[in-house]
Amino acid sequence: VLPLVDFLRRRGRQAAGALAEQLGISRATLMRAVRAAGDELVVRGAARRTQYAARRALRGQAAPLPVYRVDAEGTPQQIAWLHLTAPDGSALEMLQPLGWPLDEAARDGWFDGLPYPLQDLRPQGFLGRAFARHHAATLQVSEDPAAWSDDDTLHALSLLGEDTPGDLIVGETACRRWLQRVRAARAGEAEAPLREAELAQAYPALADAAMAAGLPGSSAGGEFPKFTAWRNGADGRPQAVLVKFSGSDDSPGTRRWSDLLVCEHLAGGVLAALGLPAAVSRIVQAGGRTFLEVERFDRHGALGRSGLVSWGAINGECFGLAGRSWAEAGRALAARGWLAAQEAQALARLWQFGRLLANTDMHDGNLSFRLGPGGGAPLAIAPVYDMLPMLYAPARGVELPPREYRPELPLPQDAAAWQAAAPVALDFWQRAAADERISAGFRGVCAENTRRLAALLG
């Protein structure tokens, strides 16, 4: 038993034939060793696809972690067991269909790291750093979540990950925390959502609290500080929102960040013309700040949740197309049957729109997918977010170097998508040039960009 387990700890998962050959034993001897090893091994696959791996402990705990899915009413249901394998992989033992598509290597549940549907649960960005800083001592992890290993991430998620993006929860402790929220909401004990009349006072206070958490300089890193909140929705139900905000001073850099928040709101308003869903947003100006309030599309009412996975997570696990365009992502997904052809075409239009919008930050994490409708491709484009002219973001958070808008004509293979996107981008620039929530100086930039794009259209 020991040679088998030690070998698998060093070498990672192995198929039966290769394992017997490398150990110099017969299949029958191997099967006896596997049975004797018992729970020290993780076994997945059937017949010739069977593979074996040594079980790995998480902070001294060798038991597998339950994975739960939260439904539209807020009720969690276990869908899988997550087994950790040596030296640094994992295996999903499905109790219900996962829903998210898997490539051939992952069909039996094997992953080289965390399963990709769990990758976006890891803390990241402004809110993720705030979470890490607040809980680092308790969790015994770095204050920088970018430095966390997969095991650090799983440890944090299993204890405190009850309210991450999407609809998945890992670990019994985190699930119990979610159930405490459910109980409080159903008993009428949860904090009441903000009323419309309260926003002008509440949002500046929440922004001050977010900045006081000790995370200054996020704009210097090219991102907006933000907070989450609940407010009364138009239908009377509680609505979860993500709120980005500008600084409160009147410096040129702060005014530019404010302008860009308004631009993001305006961009979302024209995307329907491209056949694309966009996150529902609005601008609130109060307390000397500009707030972009975005309705969370993975939350429904007080407790409901739905699944969400970024292209970055899917790409890293299944495609390896880092640094490629979203148009190429759409083609790759459609070629595998994971995305409908018309959705892939919509992604090509979105990519061209973003380029004509001067969005220089269309990375893999800024594109996400939902589960597709039953009977069709497994993926569907999630509402678009973070679409704004980042070319004009202040350098180092404060400086405003001159930036030149230079829209380009498309290559022949991109012409159809470009021709669909260009009039919509022109509409955006026209709206931005006329919107008085944007500073006069940047409205002038938008007006000049309108002229340049109109000239290119002919």
Where are these regions (language model features)?
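Phosphate/dinucleotide-binding and metal-coordinating scaffold of catalytic cores
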Residues: 2-458
